[in-house]
Amino acid sequence: VAKCSTSECGHACQQAGCRNSGCRYGSCICVGC
């Protein structure tokens, strides 16, 4: 399971063209894709 951190999620979401909406259960929540 990937470690959940705001910076990691923000980068992952940005790479996918999305915005970070936080994280839950170790997974990034991306919105606006």
UniProtKB/Swiss-Prot annotation:
Subcellular location: Secreted
Keywords, in A-Z order: Disulfide bond, Ion channel impairing toxin, Potassium channel impairing toxin, Secreted, Toxin, Voltage-gated potassium channel impairing toxin
Function: Reversibly blocks voltage-gated potassium channels Kv1.2/KCNA2, Kv1.3/KCNA3 and, weakly, Shaker B.
Organism: Pandinus imperator (Emperor scorpion)
Family, similarity comment: Belongs to the short scorpion toxin superfamily. Potassium channel inhibitor family. Alpha-KTx 24 subfamily.
Tree of life domain: Eukaryota
Extra remark: Negative results: does not inhibit voltage-gated potassium channels Shab, Kv1.2/KCNA1 and Kv1.4/KCNA4.
Post-translational modification: Contains 4 disulfide bonds.
Protein name: Potassium channel toxin alpha-KTx 24.1
Domain notes: Has the structural arrangement of an alpha-helix connected to antiparallel beta-sheets by disulfide bonds (CS-alpha/beta).
